[in-house]
């Protein structure tokens, strides 16, 4: 990374290197039942990455295929655990299970705003899931998972700018079969699963899968006598396969998932975890204007009830939750799909019709500390919901005696997205806000956290009035502190955002066989996207409107202290545009866009075992709306050079609705690759470069979520994009260029010297970096100051080096039919920054995660007993670190040091899962 050298522990690197010397992801089984025999006899791997059943070695694109056996051995129950066997993939979840994010080659959708679509599209049985996090459910019985890297779109479904994860479940079988599985582990983990399949008639077969999971939480909340980040979920999927003729089949799938869980806890980042924290988590002693050591916000939080031990947790998983606050949430996810395949003789027709309904509500102690600053109450009226209908048609065949393998298709989707939010200020917010202002500057001598306005009675108000010039201005400021102190348990009653997305596309993907060894692939896609948006706000924060009414004139006071305090009081009283001025107000907008994307590939097979290829792809991800009222306007805005704070002064909320829009993301991708495959050994390599324009970035700056479409400027702006000004660093529109480049090398290999022994390995080196000069949109507007660390640095959650390795050994034990199982996998990751604003306090050192499984299996694997461990060495690390909401002290010496680009901001982190272990019993009939 630009800010720190790679420091992955040497022993971790050596561990992975030893496995790499032996062995990438275990590769997929057959794409359809009729290919299984061929795979068993030849070792060939069949995928449908190009819309046709092809040998993996014949596919001229970068794709990893993970088999059901490998998924079972690695303990993968959802797509997060694919990280262990796919080095270019990173899947993580943060503030909510619904907000999971997938990244490929360092690129993914950043942040948890549902208005942003996924850079990495997730499909389950050909049906698009609206956001990556929706794919974090239990998967049931899986045939294989394909991970395609690079822009997608010419093969069908929804387009994606970074890649695709395609999950294929096991189909119904016309031979009877059943299996059961029971697992018990630490944290009182219990997982029960099973499936049954078989014929219902000569032409009709069925399958039912079911999973039930429960587990205690990884965090403890002693204040509320509970645990957090637990599991309590179930999943059921039923299928019917009807084959009335050899040429026609219908596959009907219905599934339902329910989750009733508490998620997601976070703890403070301290200087034992990240050296750049320094003294940020120490109280200021004494509490004085310069505060040579420590941080005044620590004094405030401590004095209002946060135990001082909570600021130095290391990796301790004890939460300090506000009394009565809860992380409880409920999620339901269900849908139905129908896949029709019809062999017309000269062509094959495929139709996939799907309907999905996903709804998730989550409470939270949104400040992640004991002091009650922000919260969301678990409620049936607060949720995010996706209702999606999709229809895909593909027609594929051959022409000119097999010279042309053609595919044409169409896709249509209609999606309703509803977000209802009830974020409110906590019962201690008013005192917290006033103390935050009083404690950090020249007025620190008035600090009195047990008194109204956080000032010493009598003396405090008088001193405030005198310090701000006396007269009416002084009275306004003194009264403003008293008024802000009353801002408790106010905010959103219900804010409702609604977005309808209508997307249709035409696509074609054609393979031209120039010679027996040379192919040219040409693909094209036209996409038309229309989005309609409306929102209605409910808010009871009358303190904001009262502060605006009494203090707006003081924003232009000749007294500098009065101006600063008036701005601080209004800003804290109206954080995130939480104001009764919006109560009952509705806004609406719409946008339309269309885009032509495509791919061109040349592949050459000099020998039967070797293929080389070169490709170019143009990718696209739709623009949309920031579903967050905080983006409508800044707390203090200028009108004709005069500061103001109300919506009315700016023409009302509807006049500002354009501030919520963001542009589509575009990518130009280039790739050179080679694939070598024999029965015993396979190796694939790819060199790639991807240039992203309008890179959609969602960042929480400690106060609000902001969305910018990051671009580069071909003219050096003299580091004006790295200062604290929102007005410097503009670029002429004609000089705007791509803002993000991802380039690197991927290697995947597998060695199978014996049917009972397999070793696999993968390596991804990726340099995913922002340009040196950045702007905030395609017109060249300045980059937001909150993003001033981005220019020239690596993207968040984009480690430069990742290696994966696995060893599988299933030896026969004598002649009784018994066999053993030994499986181990490892993933080593170099340093990376987990925060989208790239503050050094969010950096994560490199680490290695090892999973292992040993077992005994009966004849024909009719039964098995397995012992397993995930994260065997109990490695602690952060998935994402973030600015602790509203918890920033006053900037003063020595925090002007570059080590503290966030001033006195505190930071919190979502930890990854600790070591888990247990026993699994399997039975198959």
Predicted regions and their residues:
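Gram-negative outer-membrane beta-barrel transporters
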Residues: 33, 403, 409, 516-520, ...
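Outer-membrane beta-barrel translocator/receptor signature
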Residues: 100, 117-119, 131, 140-149, ...
